[in-house]
Amino acid sequence: MGGFMKRSQYKFYYKLITFFCLLSTIPVILVGLFSYEHSQKTAISNVSEEKFDTLQQTQQSIEHILKTVDHSLTHYVSSPPLLRTLSEPLHSDQFQIYNQVNQELNYLQSFDTDLSNMTLVSYTKKWYMNNSGLYRLNTDTLHEAASAYTKQKASRSYWTLEENNHLISTKEGTAENCRYNINLIKQLPLNSTNTKGLAAASIPSCSLVKNMPGYSNANNLFIIDEKGLIILHNNMSDVGESLHNDGFVQKVLAQTANSGQFETVIDRIHYKVTYQKSDYNAWTYFSLVSLPELKKEAKSIGWITFAVCLILLTLSLLFSWLGSRHFYKPIRVLYESFARHGAIQEKQQPPQNEFELIEQSFKQLKDRNDDLEETMKQQATHLQQYFMVRLMLGKLTDEEVDNRFESLGLKQNWRHLALLVLQIDTLNHTPYEKKDMDLLLFAVNSLIERNIPTDKHLAPAVVDKQQATILINQSGTKEEFMAELNETARMIQEKAEAELQLSVSIGISQPFDVLTKAKTAYAEGSEALKYRLKAENKSIIFYEDLDQKKTFKTHFPKQLQHELFDAVKAGDKEKADKCLHAILQAIFTQNTNPYQFQIAIARFLNHVIELMHVLGIELFELEENKMLYDQIFELKTFEDTENWLKNEFIDPMTDKVNARADAQYKNISDNIIHIIHHEFESELTLDEIARRLHYNPNYLSSIFKKEMGISFSEYVSSYRHHMAKSWLAETDMAVKDIAEKLKYKNSQNFIRSFKKLEGITPGNYRQQKRSM
């Protein structure tokens, strides 16, 4: 034992420390992970919102420039002087017109719009002019360049991305990093399909891109037109590329919403895509943010979170260790105390930790205490029940009652007492048998103890196949106590039926105030239950409600008894059962005292036994007859009494009588049939047969019809017809001779009778049988 203690010493203490460490570590780790994840998501969300705002600002800045150029150029090219100029050849003598137009073009470039060049082309007079001067469309190259603009779009005014060409160019367009220009093309005149020329405003892409944020892996912003062509990009090398076949571009172009955000994968890299569609020129503004790059930027948050969690984890582990020592201190004291005193029994398994040793020790103490309490409780209960049995049987003196009552822990604190005597009505239609009666009475004992407060009753007891309980009235009046007794008895009946499926009746004594009167009270309760034969099942009978007049005059239904005995002699079981029920009903109704019941029932039983002997029927051995009176007096209900008499006497006697009659009837019927079969050729009459058999003709007629199902004359006619068919089929006897043998007056009567039964004449019947 000592070796085990050394090996397992403080095992639970280490588990407790481990538990507290886990209890403090897991929340810190979870909070740290949650904080990092939440911070990362918040950072990405903030960046997404920032990109959306940046995209809107970029759109506003660029469209402000484009709209300014568009409005200024539209206003200028719509003026009548300019339109007239397109029809002028602009020779040297028209220098003033050229100078005026050139000044206007230069004026348009003076606004802060990043315009680099303005071009005006006249198709009709074949000239064009820009910042460099006036030129003639005298070469095929220039002519083709000018004609190409009339075929590009149906719109009279549009923005387009172009490189420098022979007709429209900028000085910045010659640089490698600024090859593209954003050109505003307007066909002139604007409101006519008869194109005379065009006006073009050129903005270098490298100038407009200054209005966009700088390019980085985490900041990729560009603009595409409705065909997916990159118009502007903060990475100038990507300007002019087509993204029309890219999935995310097709998805956005197919959307009806003007703006939105979603995630996509491009070249196996996850991006956050933000887009904004322009209502001005059908361009779409895109911002692509690399999520891995964003997460790299959020790593600083992760390191800060890790540092904070590490500090919290260190503190929590320290507090866990100190807290475990503090909480374990009382457990350690208990453990060492039980370990020193060797509380473990030899047969028990050695404990695995401190708590198991303490638990086993406490269980041993509790088991010993419970056993002691249960023993004392059982002894006290048994002593109380034994005391109550002796009290009700009157085997205790006044002095013994007082001494033992107090020694059993009971207090004499009451105003009235009353004794309830309970009997089980019947075990018919229940799952119990007669052998279960004692167990059922003890079950009722337990039921009463559970459902009636202990201050309202003394210990219930089982006395002579009855259950008896003394109820207590501490302060109420006698009338209130009687009402309470009725309610309590009703409750006991309901509980017995619900829990035990039993029907019980209860007899209640008169109230008394001294325990020594319990014997008289028990006799009163038992006496009250004797009246249950007159009442129904589940009766509650108060002794003080009984008719106490002493009388020995009994009422007996003699006429009903005669009718019953006649029915038995006639073998009429149905009538016999009805008469038995009527006799018992009369006895129970007309005799109000239980002693009168017993006298009348005993008288009836004597007469039944006499009838049994008169009829020569023995249902019992002589020795058994002595027990019949004890059996019938033990029956408690009308139904039980009726069933016992019916099953033990009336029905068996009726069956015996019927069996005898059936045998006699069959013998008589067989004799009559024998005479008919051998003497059918003679003049047979029922009177003649009755004379020979020494019976009344009417009696023989009824017996024969009862046994055979047809009358005597019908049977004779049927048998003679049978013999006629046999003679016709098997002999050559003439029809006339057959009619004479069968005692027909003439052959015509025989022929008519035969044809009526068979449907053909005797001659035809004979021919039919012989032809078969």
Curated annotation (Swiss-Prot):
Chief location of this protein within or outside the cell: membrane
TM spans (from-to): 16-36, 301-321
Listed InterPro entries: CdaR_GGDEF, dCache_1, Homeodomain-like_sf, HTH_AraC
Keywords, in A-Z order: Cell membrane, DNA-binding, Membrane, Transcription, Transcription regulation, Transmembrane, Transmembrane helix
Domain called HTH araC/xylS-type: residue spans: 670-768
Membrane topology category: Multi-pass membrane protein
Domain of life assignment: Bacteria
Compartment(s): Cell membrane
DNA-binding region: 687-708, 735-758
One GO CC term on file: plasma membrane
One annotated GO molecular function: sequence-specific DNA binding
Protein name per Swiss-Prot or TrEMBL: Uncharacterized HTH-type transcriptional regulator YtdP
Source organism: Bacillus subtilis (strain 168)
